[in-house]
Amino acid sequence: MRIDNLVRITQGELYQTPSIAQIDGVSFDPDRVKSGDLYICKNNSQESLKKAISSGAYALLSEKTFDVTDKEIAWIKVEDLELALIKLARYFIATNKIDSYLINPKEKLIFDALSKPKGLSFIENSLDKLIESFFNSKKTLVILSENEDTLKQIAPNYKALPTCNEEVFISSKSLFYSTFLFNGKAFNALPISPFFIPSFVKVLFFLQNFEWSFSNIKPLTHFRAIFITKKFRMLPFGMGEKALIVEENLKLFKEEILYLKSRICQKDLLIAAPKSLNLEVDFEYDALEEIFNLDTRFKYILLFANYEDLLSLFEKKDSNKELTLF
């Protein structure tokens, strides 16, 4: 990109007229700057600017007034760096006619669990990686994000993933594995709950537009089960008739409540969550350890908690049990 275009798009102030006319790439890390790069300084550090120059940066973008130490470098100051990045993103998206999609948490989980074709850029809370991909010759075909506010700023014409109208035949009684038929292909005993299958199919339908084929799917990091005994001892996966289903995403937790209530008899299901969430559930707790006092006549307990924290509690409980035996 030419320096004069960069200044115009970001509405920045160029501190002098350097002999360098354009940049070849971009970096947000002074330690990763290459010769010809634009260094975008988010920490407003003069030391970071000096390091970027010594690494070969051709241009510097910052919202801090800096000491110009090299007359051959394009020093560009903006009033608001985040706003400047939004303007850059909007420029690239508009000029390259890049499609943008708002995805929900379930769809994002499916994307994360699959191998993905080249050209998909996922935005979370920062535009850094997207800006780097634009400048560093990584062709972006599609932008996807759960963050609607960000999409409104950089791609106001964003869409939802297209809906697949093809009927999906699900023949799975398990809560944790799925067998179904879609688009003439049988998917047998996939390690995901039927709860996620509509989203899974939607993502598959979307990915058919790319050079991509399904190979496998990694276990999802939500709606995770811990099988237990009546005395709350952990069992290997699938080896018991009772299970804790653990979720830490509040939006998914609320959806999972409705799903489980549609699949399980009321007498077999208990919903538990921290008191701080102020939800209408069967059991509220202040400390996660309190779940060990629950009545295990229930077959399934949907629990709002961090999975790793819960595993640590079980390990501690088992360790204390072993110590009392000696």
PLM feature spans:
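Predominant activation on well-ordered alpha-helical scaffold segments within soluble catalytic domains
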Residues: I86-R90, F200-Q208, L258
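A conserved, hydrophobic alpha-helical segment in the catalytic core
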Residues: P191-R224, F298-N306
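Short, polar loop motifs at secondary-structure junctions
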Residues: L60-V68, K106-K108, L127, S145-T150, ...
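A short glycine/serine-rich beta->alpha loop
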Residues: N43, A186-P194
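Conserved beta-strand scaffold positions in the cores of enzyme catalytic domains, especially
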Residues: W75-K77, S100, G119-F122, N157-A160, ...
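N-terminal leader/targeting and accessory segments in enzymes
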Residues: M1-I86, I226-R233, F237, V246-F326
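Extended acidic/charged loop-beta regions that coordinate divalent cations
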Residues: E146-F187, R224-G240, E248, K317
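Walker A (P-loop) phosphate-binding motif
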Residues: K87-N147, P191, K230-F232, M239-L250, ...
